[in-house]
Amino acid sequence: MAALNLSKRSICETCGHQGWKNSLVTCSKCRIACEHCYCMRESSFETSIHFVCADCSMRPVQNKFTSDSIKGVPRSIRNKVRVESSNPVPKWKKIPETSRMKLISPEEVKKLACGGSTSKPTFRVPRPVSARPPMGLTKPTAGFPRARSLNSTVVARKTKSIYLPPKKVEPLSPRTQQIRPGVMRQASKAQAVGEGSKSKVGDGAKYHDSNEICRSILSEKLLQLLPYRPALHPIWKGRIVDSATPSEFNGEFLAQPASKVRGKAYILSKAIPVLLKVKLVPIGNLLSGLFMNRKPGLSDVEMYIFPDDKNTKRFTAERDHIFEAMRIRNAMMKFNINGTPLLIFSSKLLDKSSQIIIKMQKKTNNFLWGIFLLTKKSLALLPGTSNQTPQHFDDGYVVDNDTEPFFRRYHRNCGKQLQRHYGQRD
C-alpha cells in the first residue's frame, strides 16, 4: 500500500506523468503535490525550494484552532485525504460541470472575436442536420471558425436551402450564329487587351489556343482557294498602254492564268497580243451585277497580271501611274480578243482574304486580274454590248494548268516580238 501511495505521489500535477523523478519538486506546505521544474511557469532555484501548489496557494491561512482540529482527525482518514489530494485532475480529462469554466455558443465566440459585448450567455441544444439538398440549388454559407479550447463543442448549424430561379437565356441572333466560336473568342480577347486588362496565369495557354484556331481557319481558307491560285508558268508577257493617250502610262507586265480556268478563257488568253492597247472604262455597277452584290474572290479570277520584276526608276513610276489612274477614275481596262471582251480590274477590288493570299505568294499588293465575258447575260451588263452575241460560248470545259503542259514556243515568240517592239520604240 505504501508503494502504491508513493507511486501516486510522484506524479506531476501539471502534465500528469512521472517524468524525471529528480526534477520533481514537492509543495512546501502540503508536502504532497509535486510538479516538474520544467513544467513550472517560473523556474528558478528559489522557486524549487519554496514551491507552493495551486491548492495551497488558494487555501486561506488556517488559525491555531483549525490546525488543532485537523490534528484531532484520525491518522487513517488523514492519509486517505492526502492520497486523494495528490491526484490532481489532468488537463486532458473532461472538466466536471461544477468547475468555474463555462461553455459558450459559437455566436458568442464570433461576437468576442469581433470585439462586441455579449449579454447573458445562451446555450442551444444541437439540432440534427437535415438531408443535403441537390447541388446548385443552395448558396454556400460561411461557417464559424473552430474553437481551439479543449472543452469547446461543435454546434452544427442547419443550412437554409435557397432555391434559385432558372436563368433566362436569350437566343442568339442569326448574325451571331454565323460567326465561328473561335473568331468570337479572338474578338473578345482583342477587346480585353484594348481596354488595358492585365494578363493572368493561364493567358499563355489561351493565346496559344487562339493562334491555333486562327491557323486552322486560315488553312481551311487556303484549301478552298488553292485551285484558283495563279499558275506556275506565265502565259503572256508584254506591255499595256492606253489607246486614247499612249503617253499617259506604258508598263511591262506578265500574265498567269488561274490554276483551274474555263477552257474558252484559256484559249483566249493565249491570243493576247504583245502590245495590249486597252481602253479605260468606268466600272459603275458592273461588278454588282456580275457577282450578285458581293466582292469578287480568287474563284472569280481567270487571269492574273503582275508587274515585271524590274526595279528601275522609270518602270516603277509607270507602274505606279497605272494603278493610280485606275483608282482615281474608278475605272477598268477593256480589250476585245477575237470579239470577246476582256475586262481587267485592280487588285483592290478583291476581298481581303484573296489579297492576303496573293501577297503571301507573290510579295506584292498591286496587281491586275481579268475575266472574259463569255455569256449573253454577262455581255448585257456591259454598256455598248447589250445586243452583242458572244462569239465563244462557255462549253463547261475546265483546264487544269497545274497538270497540263504549256506551249513554251509561244513564250519564245513573245520575247522576240518584245525585242522588236522595244527597238522600234527607241
Curated annotation (Swiss-Prot):
Which InterPro entries does the record match to this protein?
AIPP2-like_SPOC, PHD1-3/5-6
* Binding site residues for Zn(2+) 1: 12, 15, 36, 39
Coiled-coil residues are: none
Matching entries from Pfam families are given as: SPOC_AIPP2 (PF23121)
**Keywords linked to the UniProt accession:** Metal-binding, Transcription, Transcription regulation, Zinc, Zinc-finger
Q: Which GO terms describe its molecular function?
A: histone reader activity; zinc ion binding
Q: Where does Zn(2+) 2 bind?
A: 27, 30, 53, 56
User: Which residue ranges traverse the bilayer?
Assistant: none
Instruction: Tell me a GO biological process for this protein.
Output: negative regulation of transcription elongation by RNA polymerase II
Q: What happens when the gene is disrupted?
A: No obvious developmental defects. Plants missing all PHD finger-containing proteins (e.g. PHD1, PAIPP2/PHD2, AIPP2/PHD3, PHD4, PHD5 and PHD6) exhibit an increased expression of flowering genes leading to an early flowering phenotype under long-day conditions as well as growth retardation.
Q: Where would I find the PHD-type zinc fingers in this protein?
A: 9-59
Q: Where is this region: Disordered?
A: 122-144, 185-205
Q: Which PANTHER family match?
A: GB|AAF26970.1-RELATED, PTHR33304
- Role, per record: Together with AIPP3/BDT1, cooperates to form a BAH-PHD bivalent histone reader complex able to read histone H3 lysine 27 trimethylation (H3K27me3) histone marks in order to regulate transcription, especially to prevent early flowering; promotes AIPP3/BDT1 binding to H3K27me3.
- Subunit structure, as described in the record: Interacts directly with AIPP3/BDT1.
Task: Write the protein's name.
Answer: PHD finger-containing protein 6
Write down the species.
Arabidopsis thaliana
The upper taxonomy is: Eukaryota, Viridiplantae, Streptophyta, Embryophyta, Tracheophyta
Q: Which gene encodes it?
A: PHD6
